[in-house]
């Protein structure tokens, strides 16, 4: 008679804050969307923003769209973990849903710029895993912005002008990926997430597991 299979070992851990940044058009949103579709342990931190909603975007799914006055009220009441002004618009991360998810062991994905990433590192560095996505060339970056066909030519040129300043912050991130092949870039991000979830200091349930393991008396 074969012995019954034991249940998979479940070790409690604290959720991680996965930050993915890049200049517009480098691929962070596509990578983020694919992660959310394929990994049930990851939830999206939905940012608040004052920018105009694009035709393809859904309220409270892609962003919480707010007026400048509403945004300032959230910021001034300490309801945002981080905030930044990007391309003339305000963006910020609501505090409450993130802290709740982290405490329950769920990972939160942040599609934010270097300013937001910097603020999160300053406030919650032990929880943050940051990834910067680079385009293979500036020419390809420009082509992707045109293919997206969601912004005017004026907006595209503004994004290109700002991209060099954004790229200059790549050294501030834990990991850097060149997105010349989307599948390869996605594989790299998934590998990072798997490894970071196994870090000893993130798995607070490991202490009890090891203690019980050492106290166990084997029985045949």
UniProtKB/Swiss-Prot annotation:
Binding positions (ATP): 22-29
CDD domains, A to Z: GMPK
GO cellular component: a single term: cytosol
Enzyme class, broadest EC rank: transferase
Chief localization: cytoplasm
One example GO MF annotation: ATP binding
Domain Guanylate kinase-like: 15-194
Keywords: ATP-binding, Cytoplasm, Kinase, Nucleotide-binding, Transferase
EC number: 2.7.4.8
SMART domains: GuKc (SM00072)
Catalytic reaction(s) noted: GMP + ATP = GDP + ADP
Classification via NCBIfam families: guanyl_kin
Name of the molecule in the record: Guanylate kinase
Native source organism of the sequence: Rhizobium johnstonii (strain DSM 114642 / LMG 32736 / 3841) (Rhizobium leguminosarum bv. viciae)
């Amino acid at each position: 008679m074969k012995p019954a299979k034991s249940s998979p070992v479940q070790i409690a851990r604290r959720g991680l804050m996965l930050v993915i940044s890049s200049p517009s058009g480098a691929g962070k949103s596509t990578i983020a969307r694919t992660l959310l579709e394929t990994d049930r342990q990851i939830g999206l931190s939905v940012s608040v923003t004052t920018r105009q909603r694009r035709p393809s975007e859904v309220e409270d799914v892609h962003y919480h769209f707010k007026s400048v006055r509403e945004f300032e009220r959230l910021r001034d009441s300490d309801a945002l973990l981080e905030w930044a002004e990007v391309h003339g618009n305000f963006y910020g991360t609501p505090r409450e849903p993130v802290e709740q998810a982290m405490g329950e062991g769920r990972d939160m994905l942040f599609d934010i710029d270097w300013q937001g990433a910097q603020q999160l590192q300053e406030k919650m560095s032990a929880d943050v895993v940051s990834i910067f996505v680079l385009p293979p060339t500036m020419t390809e970056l420009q082509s992707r912005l045109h293919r997206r066909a969601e912004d005017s030519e004026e907006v595209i040129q503004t994004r290109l002008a700002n991209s060099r300043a954004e790229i200059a912050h790549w050294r501030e991130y834990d990991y850097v990926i060149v997105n010349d092949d989307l599948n390869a870039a996605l594989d790299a991000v998934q590998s990072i997430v798997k490894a970071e979830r196994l870090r000893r200091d993130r798995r607070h349930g490991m202490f009890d597991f090891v203690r019980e393991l050492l106290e166990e008396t084997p029985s045949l």
